[in-house]
């Protein structure tokens, strides 16, 4: 059974996932031997991914100031903004992979631009889908993308974004991933000429690492 929730903003979704995993997660060890608590197939729909505004709007250029960051969380400010920009940049920046590189350059095609073109040509298109998984490399590598797919749909003048993660570090990565996805969605929506709608994130393995158990409990206590 999938665990499905709908929230107003990104920070709220993150907190609910942390609570769910710490209360109901099963303990398993991953390929590296790390102990985690895991809930399978969490689906979070974020109604206002760009922040509480009462309406849908585009972010000011290169600014994420309207997105609330959980108090005391280590992803914030310039660090969070630079990470979010990687969703749009084709530069790997010395890493084995980045989402932006996989989406914009790795396969020899800019999937973001192609998705924008499809949506400009047909607002109702069901083909504005992008992938990061490269079977030739990722079936043999230990360092593989966690986010596998991003899909865009325009309905009633809004861009609805859906993303799939095969594996998702909820405490350490879900929040910045969601913000980066919002950054990407805002770019696509602006280019297509529509507003930013809901973002839905499906995490097949939603987990928290043992190293973050204590912090996660504190977040829940203070939440």
Curated annotation (Swiss-Prot):
Annotated catalytic residues: 146
Keywords assigned: Cytoplasm, Methyltransferase, Nucleotide biosynthesis, Transferase
Cell location: Cytoplasm
Temperature dependence of activity: Optimum temperature is 70 degrees Celsius with [5-3H]dUMP as substrate, and 50-70 degrees Celsius with Br-dUMP as substrate. Heating the protein for 10 minutes at 100 degrees Celsius abolished the activity.
SUPFAM superfamilies (alphabetical): Thymidylate synthase/dCMP hydroxymethylase
Activity versus pH, per record: Optimum pH is 9.0 with [5-3H]dUMP as substrate, and 7.0 with Br-dUMP as substrate.
Record-level GO cellular component terms: cytosol
Pathways involved: Pyrimidine metabolism; dTTP biosynthesis
GO BP: dTMP biosynthetic process; dTTP biosynthetic process; methylation
Role this protein plays: May catalyze the biosynthesis of dTMP using an unknown cosubstrate. In vitro, also catalyzes the dehalogenation of 5-bromo-deoxyuridine monophosphate (Br-dUMP) and the tritium exchange of [5-3H]deoxyuridine monophosphate ([5-3H]dUMP).
Quaternary structure (record): Monomer.
NCBIfam families named in the record: thy_syn_methano
Protein name: Putative thymidylate synthase
Organism the protein comes from: Methanothermobacter marburgensis (strain ATCC BAA-927 / DSM 2133 / JCM 14651 / NBRC 100331 / OCM 82 / Marburg)
Lineage: Archaea, Methanobacteriati, Methanobacteriota, Methanomada group, Methanobacteria
């Amino acid at each position: 059974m999938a665990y499905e929730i709908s929230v107003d903003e990104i920070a709220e979704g993150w907190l609910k996932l942390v609570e769910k995993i710490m209360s109901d997660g099963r303990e398993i060890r991953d390929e590296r031997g790390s102990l985690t608590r895991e809930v399978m197939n969490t689906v979070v729909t974020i109604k206002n991914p760009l922040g509480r505004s009462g309406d849908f709007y585009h972010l000011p250029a290169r600014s994420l100031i309207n997105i609330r960051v959980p108090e005391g969380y280590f992803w914030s400010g310039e660090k969070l903004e630079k990470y979010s920009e990687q969703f749009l940049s084709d530069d790997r920046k010395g890493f084995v992979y980045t989402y932006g590189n996989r989406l914009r350059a790795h396969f020899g095609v800019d999937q973001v631009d192609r998705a924008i073109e499809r949506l400009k040509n047909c607002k109702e298109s069901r083909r504005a889908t992008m992938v990061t998984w490269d079977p030739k490399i990722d079936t043999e590598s230990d360092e593989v993308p966690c986010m596998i797919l991003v899909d865009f749909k325009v309905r009633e003048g809004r861009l609805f974004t859906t993303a799939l993660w095969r594996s998702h570090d909820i405490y350490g990565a879900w929040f910045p991933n969601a913000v980066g996805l919002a950054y990407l969605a805002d770019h696509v929506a602006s280019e297509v000429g529509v507003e930013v709608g809901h973002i839905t994130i499906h995490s097949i393995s939603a987990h928290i690492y043992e190293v973050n158990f204590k912090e996660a409990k504190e977040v829940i206590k203070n939440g």
